[in-house]
Amino acid sequence: MLAGRCDKLSVTELSMGGTLILYLAEHHPEIAGVIPINAPVFMTDNRVPILPIIRHLIASTPAIASDIIEPGIVEPAYDRTPTAGAHEMVKLFGVTRRDLGLISQPLLVMRSTYDHVVPHECAPFIMEHTASTDKEMVVFERSAHVVTMDYDKDGVIDSAWKFIQRLSH
């Protein structure tokens, strides 16, 4: 197990993975640092309120993939999203959003200016509702949702590396 081999653990993830690491940080205060990237804690899509019904009527919908500005870059992704899975994801957003105040670890929130998937208000919401006194938001001006594959990918790596290095000392 990684925790047994390291003095400090930091976690980072993109999109729904970012939501999952926020949830993880809420329940594991021993995590040294948290780096969500374009992490949703709510969605503004008008279909969200009817997901509990839709999931029984429609098995899946076209997936969102390759929200990337840099030409020629394609994100490997599924072509469909199960509606039951989307419903569970929205429930996770609610639980995670409710408990953001439990996060006291150092926090580096990253978001992209041209994200067409996650509402831009999520990053400031995370910043405002977490208890961490050591938090920073980095905005990437040239990328869309999949910033880790887009123009600003090196900036993501550099920002995360500097954050983790700072926490290591």
Residue positions per predicted region:
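Catalytic active-site module of serine/aspartate enzymes centered on a nucleophile-bearing elbow/loop
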Residues: E141-H169
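Short beta-strand/loop motif that positions the catalytic acidic residue
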Residues: I103, V109-R111, D115
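Conserved alpha/beta-hydrolase "acid-adjacent" motif
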Residues: H116-C122
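Active-site nucleophile elbow and catalytic-triad environment of alpha/beta-hydrolase enzymes
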Residues: P82-D99, Q105
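Gly/Ala-rich beta-loop-alpha elbow adjacent to hydrolase catalytic centers
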Residues: E13-G17, I21
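Active-site nucleophile loop of the alpha/beta-hydrolase fold
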Residues: T19, I35-D45
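Catalytic histidine neighborhood in serine/cysteine hydrolases
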Residues: P124, E128-V146
